[in-house]
């Protein structure tokens, strides 16, 4: 059963506590999954470019009977992107794949590219800051939130 409970971020934005994750759902099937989830009350969805299903997620949202403003959409910046221009292009490309006007939350999926995790000591601090700096140039209609995900202290 869907919960409409939210968490309040420091900036006042409310994020749904439960989002339907779309990892491992192929692009053709995810459209139907999104529509069925909306029909039972889900209003928040999580995807990523690496999942290969952003287009289907967008179609599922676009073809539903629910207003876009009532849906909370999260996607992720590919782990290999660690620069200002790459971030801009990734957001524009994601919007094209979704065929939607904005993304509610963009997560920086990992501080390191996947192939480097736990192997290379470069933590990409400058690159991640470049991802973050790009947010100040976003128009509000493109993206509400830019958040770091899977950042941890190495022990």
Task: Give the role of each language-model region.
Residues 10, 47, 77, 96, ...:
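Short, flexible active-site loop motifs that bind/organize anionic cofactors or intermediates
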Residues 23-25, 48-50, 76-80, 108-111, ...:
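Active-site beta-loop-alpha junctions enriched in small/polar residues
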Residues 54-55, 81-83, 115-116:
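Short active-site-adjacent helix-start/loop capping segments
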Residues 87-155:
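Glycine/proline-rich, positively charged
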Residues 63-66, 82, 96-100:
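Short, charge-rich binding segments
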Residues 1-71, 132, 136-139:
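N-terminal binding-site loop/beta-alpha segment at the start of enzyme catalytic domains
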Residues 16-28, 76-85, 119-125:
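Active-site mouth loops of central-metabolism enzymes
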Residues 15-19, 43-44, 70-76, 102-107, ...:
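Structural preference for beta-strand elements that scaffold enzyme active sites
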């Amino acid at each position: 059963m869907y919960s409409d409970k939210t968490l309040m971020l420091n900036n006042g934005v409310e994020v749904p506590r439960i989002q339907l994750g779309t990892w491992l759902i192929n692009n053709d099937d995810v459209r139907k999954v999104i529509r069925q989830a909306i029909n039972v009350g889900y209003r928040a969805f999580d995807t990523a470019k690496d999942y290969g299903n952003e287009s289907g997620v967008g179609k599922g949202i676009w073809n539903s009977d629910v207003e876009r403003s009532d849906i909370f959409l999260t996607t992720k910046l590919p782990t290999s992107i660690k620069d200002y221009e790459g971030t801009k292009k990734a957001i524009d490309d994601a919007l094209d794949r979704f065929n939607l006007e904005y993304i509610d939350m963009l997560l920086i999926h990992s501080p390191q590219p996947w192939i480097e995790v736990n192997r290379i000591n470069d933590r990409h601090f400058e690159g991640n800051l470049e991802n973050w700096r790009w947010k100040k140039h976003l128009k509000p209609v493109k993206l509400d939130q830019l958040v770091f995900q899977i950042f941890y202290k190495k022990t």
